[in-house]
Swiss-Prot record:
Gene name linked to the record: MEN1
Positions of the UniProt region annotated as Disordered: 460-552
Domain of life: Eukaryota
Oligomeric form and interacting partners: Component of the MLL-HCF complex, at least composed of KMT2A/MLL1, MEN1, ASH2L, RBBP5, DPY30, WDR5, HCFC1 and HCFC2. Component of the menin-associated histone methyltransferase complex, at least composed of KMT2B/MLL4, MEN1, ASH2L, RBBP5, DPY30 and WDR5. Interacts with POLR2B. Interacts with POLR2A phosphorylated at 'Ser-5', but not with the unphosphorylated, nor 'Ser-2' phosphorylated POLR2A forms. Interacts with FANCD2 and DBF4. Interacts with JUND (via MBM motif); inhibits the interaction of JUND with MAPK10 and the phosphorylation of JUND by MAP kinases MAPK8 and MAPK10.
Impact when changing residue 255 to K: Found in isolated hyperparathyroidism; likely pathogenic
Post-translational modification Phosphoserine, affected residues: 487, 543
Entry keywords, A to Z: Chromatin regulator, Disease variant, DNA-binding, Nucleus, Phosphoprotein, Repressor, Transcription, Transcription regulation
Upper lineage: Eukaryota, Metazoa, Chordata, Craniata, Vertebrata
Localization of this protein: Nucleus
Residues with the Phosphothreonine modification: 594
Region (Interaction with FANCD2): 214-390
Expression across tissues: Ubiquitous.
Protein name: Menin
Biased composition (Basic and acidic residues): 484-500
Length: 610
């Protein structure tokens, strides 16, 4: 069985718009042809990013010239995907899979696939790969790379297994994605899971096994069960997100960037990115590079990605916040960047750091020990320059420098490190070492003592006491959302920010409740000694609340450093010792839910990418 007549009429594909039309036609079907679409994308990517030299010895291969926007008057060449080329690749893949898998040997009770059948398909893909190649190299994620070069990266193997299953008519086998790994789900309602590829640098073979162990150990790699369970349209979105436009370390293909951007907007308009937070972040990054007229701005898309993670994945995804923080960092929005990084750490604090979580560790390590220190260093330089030459700086530059005078920025920095420390607690692998401590001290030193002292750090005991007050719940809710600026008695409460902040445990902008009243009194009135008439007397005035944000630490290490962090002078030796020391408290073992709990709870909601 080859390409359908309706598919053939769309060829040849001579431009980006032709490829978009093919994808639109496939997305209009119940079952988009993953093999066809992956072959087309791989073909285009190969000749736009891998081999940009126009070959003269391949008679079937031609390139379509078109005007280039830069430089004016120049030409750009698009590889023409002729039907004969794509059909031959398609026939080769389907023949290879159908010739190697005898479906009669694997009965499908109830029309669903068995683990043995899924394992067999993965064996076919696995055994067809070259024995030795660099598995992290670029441009080996598509079926075009598999057919023409017998090379695939880790996620490419998982996608190839799903594509092969579709070619065999196994419609219950779908792609499952965390933020750094891929496997498959199958069976009734997609309840079964199976590893089909490797992860990381090693080639440890766990194919055929479930992912339940990874879910139970609360590793980030498996997202505690809050991973994406793709349908066919989301699998198309995955292959679009996997497009790699890089020609080399310093150059991207503009044609591939445009193709990826247009395809993502097509998927967005059809509603297929609603449950795909990282695809929304990817699209936002592309819009930042080249805005599309009449489309949502990047900031809106970043927040849509965060909202998707909150709605469908229990707010347990890291990268939606990383995308947002990166945007603010590039635009030198220091306060917003620190808040987004703090939100990221608040998500990671509920995970255990395991040996296969190296990728997210490297992300946090770079943020803590490179990006934040340099951002604060630049802000300090601008602040110093502004003090020496007032009035000469732009408003944005002044805002960046003033971040070091904002206690909320300092509170976000503390919340970021608190999340990292909490992540380490109870984990089988330590996170923090002296390198972290050195840059923590450096970042703390960017804030003057009087700024740091405006942050009020409270203990859980104080929270419990406030629970007795009539307004204690509101205050506690604000604390769970992270640092907040308290309203002064003589000022009206600040307006609430748009609902773009992180939810429980991370946001900002909650306002404190009314001042406390002594028990048994009502503001503005006092009962006379005989209990008769009431006389208007001033109510007892409570001491004004602190001006700065209020913060509750979750980690034992940060609780132990509470006084050191807000001291007038920074005791770097004590902070380094405390941060790198093993926790002195006996951590309670977290009750691990059974793997089925995660699976079933997720299926009641139903729903990235790499």
């Amino acid at each position: 069985m080859g390409l359908k007549a309706a598919q053939k009429t769309l060829f040849p594909l001579r431009s980006i718009d032709d490829v978009v039309r093919l994808f639109a036609a496939e997305l209009g079907r119940e079952e988009p042809d993953l093999v066809l679409l992956s072959l087309v994308l791989g073909f285009v990517e190969h000749f736009l990013a891998v081999n940009r030299v126009i070959p003269t010895n391949v008679p079937e291969l031609t390139f379509q010239p078109s005007p280039a926007p830069d430089p004016p008057g120049g030409l750009t060449y698009f590889p023409v995907a002729d039907l004969s080329i794509i059909a031959a690749l398609y026939a080769r893949f389907t023949a290879q899979i159908r010739g190697a898998v005898d479906l009669s040997l694997y009965p499908r009770e109830g029309g669903v696939s068995s683990r043995e059948l899924v394992k067999k398909v993965s064996d076919v893909i696995w055994n067809s790969l070259s024995r030795s190649y660099f598995k992290d190299r670029a441009h080996i994620q598509s079926l075009f790379s598999f057919i023409t070069g017998t090379k695939l990266d880790s996620s490419g193997v998982a996608f190839a297994v799903v594509g092969a299953c579709q070619a065999l008519g196994l419609r219950d086998v779908h792609l499952a994605l965390s933020e750094d790994h891929a496997w498959v789900v199958f069976g009734p309602n997609g309840e079964q899971t199976a590893e089909v590829t490797w992860h990381g640098k090693g080639n440890e073979d766990r194919r055929g096994q479930t992912v339940n162990a990874g879910v139970a150990e609360r590793s980030w790699l498996y997202l505690k069960g809050s991973y994406m369970r793709c349908d066919r349209k989301m699998e198309v979105a995955f292959m679009v997100c996997a497009i790699n436009p890089s020609i080399d370390l310093h150059t991207d293909s503009l044609e591939l960037l445009q193709l990826q951007q247009k395809l993502l907007w097509l998927l967005y308009d059809l509603g297929h990115l609603e449950r795909y937070p990282m695809a929304l972040g990817n699209l936002a990054d592309l819009e930042e590079l080249e805005p599309t007229p009449g489309r949502p701005d990047p900031l809106t898309l970043y927040h849509k990605g965060i909202a998707s993670a909150k709605t469908y994945y229990r707010d347990e995804h890291i990268y939606p916040y990383m995308y947002l923080a990166g945007y603010h960092c590039r635009n030198r929005n220091v306060r917003e960047a620190l808040q987004a990084w703090a939100d990221t750490a608040t998500v990671i604090q509920d995970y255990n750091y395991c040996r296969e979580d190296e990728e997210i560790y490297k992300e946090f390590f770079e943020v803590a020990n490179d990006v934040i220190p340099n951002l604060l260093k630049e802000a300090a330089s601008l602040l110093e320059a502004g003090e020496e030459r007032p009035g000469e700086q732009s408003q944005g530059t002044q805002s960046q420098g003033s971040a070091l005078q904002d206690p909320e920025c300092f509170a976000h920095l503390l919340r970021f490190y608190d999340g990292i420390c909490k992540w380490e607690e109870g984990s089988p692998t330590p996170v923090l070492h002296v390198g972290w401590a050195t840059f923590l001290v450096q970042s703390l030193g960017r804030f003057e003592g009087q700024v740091r002292q405006k942050v009020r750090i409270v203990s859980r005991e104080a929270e419990a006491a406030e629970a007795e007050e009539p307004w204690g719940e509101e205050a506690r809710e604000g604390r769970r959302r992270g640092p907040r600026r308290e309203s002064k008695p003589e000022e009206p409460p600040p307006p609430k920010k748009p609902a773009l902040d992180k939810g429980l445990g991370t946001g900002q902008g909650a306002v404190s409740g009314p001042p406390r009243k002594p028990p048994g009194t009502v503001a503005g009135t006092a009962r006379g000694p005989e209990g008769g008439s009431t006389a208007q007397v001033p109510a007892p005035t409570a001491s004004p609340p602190p001006e700065g944000p209020v913060l509750t630490f979750q980690s034992e290490k940060m609780k132990g450093m509470k006084e050191l962090l807000v001291a007038t002078k920074i005791n770097s030796s004590a902070i380094k010792l405390q941060l790198t020391a093993q926790s002195q408290v006996q951590m309670k073992k977290q009750k691990v839910s059974t793997p089925s709990d995660y699976t079933l709870s997720f299926l009641k909601r139903q729903r990235k990418g790499l």
